[in-house]
């Protein structure tokens, strides 16, 4: 197992993690931004008000994109397990 192969494994793991986390982070960012704009417009300065919409939006994204996220993780793990001989060498 060479250092290039280790770096490739690390790169692929980080890429998969970023692909899986991006929709969740984007949903939380957009819902937080919308709630913040509404709070600024109505002058409501309650900091805990944005947590519930963020949680609901993230859970919605998980329920919609959950099978796709699981498929991406399973493809990556399937690839790792198929190439375990190359990793052990």
From Swiss-Prot:
InterPro entries registered for this protein in UniProt: Bac_export_3, FliQ
GO cellular component: bacterial-type flagellum basal body; plasma membrane
Membrane topology: Multi-pass membrane protein
One Pfam family per UniProt: Bac_export_3
Transmembrane segments: 18-38, 55-75
Protein's name in the database: Flagellar biosynthetic protein FliQ
NCBIfam families referenced in this protein's UniProt entry, alphabetically: fliQ
GO BP, one annotated term: bacterial-type flagellum assembly
Family per record: Belongs to the FliQ/MopD/SpaQ family.
Top-level taxonomic group: Bacteria
KW RNA-binding (keyword) present: no
Main localization (coarse): membrane
Function text: Role in flagellar biosynthesis.
Organism annotation: Buchnera aphidicola subsp. Acyrthosiphon pisum (strain APS) (Acyrthosiphon pisum symbiotic bacterium)
Keywords for this protein: Bacterial flagellum, Cell membrane, Membrane, Transmembrane, Transmembrane helix
Taxonomic path: Bacteria, Pseudomonadati, Pseudomonadota, Gammaproteobacteria, Enterobacterales
Gene: fliQ
Protein localization: Cell membrane; Bacterial flagellum basal body
PANTHER family per record: FLAGELLAR BIOSYNTHETIC PROTEIN FLIQ (PTHR34040:SF2)
């Amino acid at each position: 197992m060479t250092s290039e192969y280790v770096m490739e494994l690390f790169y692929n793991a980080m890429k998969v993690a970023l692909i899986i986390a991006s929709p969740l982070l984007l949903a939380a960012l957009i819902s937080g931004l919308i709630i913040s704009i509404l709070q600024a417009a109505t002058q409501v300065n309650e900091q805990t008000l944005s947590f519930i919409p963020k949680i609901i939006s993230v859970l919605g994204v998980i329920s919609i994109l959950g099978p796709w996220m699981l498929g991406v993780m399973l493809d990556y793990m399937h690839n790792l397990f198929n190439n375990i001989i190359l990793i052990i060498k």
